[in-house]
Amino acid sequence: MRVVITGATGNVGTSVVERLASDDTVTEVVGVARRGTDWSPPKTCWITADVAVDDLEPVFRDADAVIHLAGAFQPTHRPLATWRNNVLGSMRVFDAVASAGVPVLVHASSVGAYSPRADGERVDESWPTNALPTAAYGRVKSYVERVLDTFERDHAGVRVVRLRPGFIFKRSSTEAQRRLFVGPLLPNGTAAAGPDPGGAGPSRPASAGAAPVGRRRCVPPGSHPRRARRVQRRR
């Protein structure tokens, strides 16, 4: 089984890559990220690409599943930037999944997509996903849910799985989460519980490289390449 993961060097993406790389039923993991990485888990190829710009169909071709984790929580004060990354990027991923004939699409939405409930009671997955009108991130995720509704209607042969998690934290990404949520409000070192995801290793993206295979570069186990090749940009 060949699985492609967008946002593969992110907080969640690195854990997914690590898990799939250890799964005997998975023959190849293709990690897609805007920046490369020195991390080289088994059976993993890295492709440097921006989902909002680059041509994704060649990357998704022959994949058994695409797991779409790429997105941006910040900058909330620049809604056009988050719209580009979360909405336009997701739309291009969905289109490429359809064009490449991928049978399974897993999309990471957010608990923020759910509509508020006045009485504060718990809800299940059938609850409307119209978001809180004043929450910028939730509005974006809600819009993508509507796009995905249309995708499911038009591509009945594709199995679509939607994830709506809350915040996901792990020890190795402490420093990156500190920068994301509190920035300069928390002094450096106060939350230093693990390595920065900006380096190498699980949850630590950096720069990459490897043996070339077509338009991508694969990372053989134990190698330490310098830079992954970018995919061709659509003109």
Please give the residue ranges for each predicted region:
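N-terminal Rossmann NAD(P)H-binding glycine-rich loop of SDR-like oxidoreductase domains
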Residues: M1-T25
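Mid/C-terminal beta-alpha module of Rossmann-like enzyme folds, strongest
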Residues: G214-R235
